[in-house]
Amino acid sequence: KKECNLNSMRILFYCDTVFSFGGVQRVLAEIAKALSGKHEVTILTTDTCTDLSMYGYAESTVRFDSFSYSASSFIERLLCKGYSFLYKHGLPHTRQTSEWYAASFFPSSYKRTLARKINARQCDVVIGVHAFMALHLSAVKSRIRTKTVGWLHNSYEAFFEKETPYLPGLDCFFQVQMGKLDERVVLSHADAGCFFRKMNLCCEVIYNPLTVLPKGRGKKEYRRILAVGRFSFGHKGFDILIKAFSVFVKTHPDWTLEIVGEGPEEALYRSLINEY
């Protein structure tokens, strides 16, 4: 392991989408910019768009390194899909079968690409921004020469226990892979306790920063409701909000609802707005 000079470090964030509207993207920007005042900060991203005007990146020293994964071979895709199906629908979830599933979750050709990119940066620490990126880091842990951190932006319940969880049936795989990382960061002490009790994973707690400082107080005289978030299936509940507001506005016709965000459910929300 390389020794880190805490006074000045090379920090690499690994993230998929950076230049889009979302809570993770905004929080990443605030933390990356704050750290760049003292450290060399680079964001390694698969985002094909670069818009430095977003989130104030243009006024910072944060660097960007964009790349893409080449399509894997037909045989590799077939083997990965085949084992993934077996793991999810038949095999017992043990440490060994979870290790095998890790190979299908993130193919070898992708591992080589990611490890090569990380090693080329010669960084002191690489941080996987949200669960999937952290799982990618655990898959290449033995191939890279740097400390690894998984930064988890969702709760245990959101990953495994909600009606539409992010990682259904993958708790054993998650436990095995996250245990390989040097550190894990969660957003609350409640989450840290839950991951420790249920998975024996020790996590550091770092709260998300305030990314927008409020000015003044809202007043009911404004007659305006604002909702902000990513348009993701089964998690944000904007569809429920639209339906609820359609009931509310019948007795409060001078109120408006504004929803800000983007994501795969935008078309659904627009159709609901037209319907209600």
Regions found by a protein language model. Name each.
Residues D65, K147, E157, F174-K215:
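Donor nucleotide-sugar binding/catalytic pocket of nucleotide-sugar-dependent glycosyltransferases
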Residues T17-F19, V228-G234, G263:
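Short donor-sugar binding/catalytic loops of nucleotide-sugar-dependent glycosyltransferases
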Residues L12, G218-K236, I242-F245:
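Conserved donor-binding/catalytic core segment of Leloir-type glycosyltransferases
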Residues C15-F21, K38-W100:
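N-terminal strand-loop element at the rim of the active site
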Residues V24-L35, C49-M54, F238:
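Short amphipathic alpha-helix
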Residues R112-N119, L152-Y156, P165-R184:
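Membrane-proximal helix-turn-helix segments that form the acceptor-binding/catalytic region
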Residues P107, G128-M133, L152:
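Short His-centered aromatic/hydrophobic patch
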Residues H39-E40, F238, I242-Y276:
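A conserved nucleotide-sugar
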